[in-house]
Amino acid sequence: MSSFWSKVKDFVGFGDPLEYEEDGEEYEQVYREENKREEARRATAGTAAAATPTAAAQASDAAPMGSGPARKRVRAGNVIGMPNSGVNEVLVIEPRSFEEAPQIVQHLRDRKSVILNLTLMDSDQAQRSVDFVAGATFAIDGHQERVGDGIFLFTPSSVMISTEMPSQLRQANQAFGGNFRLNPEAPRRAQG
């Protein structure tokens, strides 16, 4: 009967933890040996600079609380260059036909924001162009916003569109005495 309860305890996780601690020591020893071999390989390859982990990598490699002393791990990570050179480019495009839509999508794929002015196109081709570019924007996890009649803003996933600007402008307008009109159709306030 006691063996049944000990099996239940082991299954639930209330069993004797000493068995698991012994296994952990074996794995640590194997891991240390693999680490030494990896460091030796890097040193012979001449990439000793890549063997020093960053602070973020050290923090993420720390052992969980209660598992004993924290161990440092050295990872062989790949550094991926970011294509953005710090300059965000916004293109204003006024296409004349649907055939220009793939070029617009290519700009989005190149991580450039596009303001699309479709007022020069007939309505059927304009609708077709918007559908095409909107579908491509969705496919690359981009964002879109209608700015005005026939004018749309399409951005890649690295650019977020915020519609909070009007409330910020209202606050700034109130801070300067409320003399600026945010809505051109709104009647002007009399200056007092």
From Swiss-Prot:
Keyword annotations from UniProtKB, A to Z: Cell cycle, Cell division, Cytoplasm, Septation
| Stretches the record annotates as Disordered | 15-70
Its predominant location is: cytoplasm
Q: Does the keyword Mitochondrion apply?
A: no
InterPro entries found in the cross-reference section: Cell_div_SepF, Cell_div_SepF/SepF-rel, SepF-like_sf
Name any GO cellular component annotation. cytoplasm
Q: Where is the composition biased (Acidic residues)?
A: 18-28
Q: Where is the signal peptide?
A: none
Q: Which Pfam families match?
A: SepF
Query: According to its UniProt record, where is this protein located?
Result: Cytoplasm
Question: According to the UniProt entry, which residue ranges have a biased composition of type Basic and acidic residues?
Answer: 29-42
Name the residue ranges with Low complexity bias. 43-63
What does the subunit comment say?
Homodimer. Interacts with FtsZ.
Q: What does this protein do?
A: Cell division protein that is part of the divisome complex and is recruited early to the Z-ring. Probably stimulates Z-ring formation, perhaps through the cross-linking of FtsZ protofilaments. Its function overlaps with FtsA.
Record family assignment: Belongs to the SepF family.
> Which PANTHER family does the UniProt entry name for this protein?
CELL DIVISION PROTEIN SEPF
Protein name, per record: Cell division protein SepF
Task: State the organism of origin.
Answer: Gloeobacter violaceus (strain ATCC 29082 / PCC 7421)
As recorded in Swiss-Prot or TrEMBL, the protein's gene is named sepF
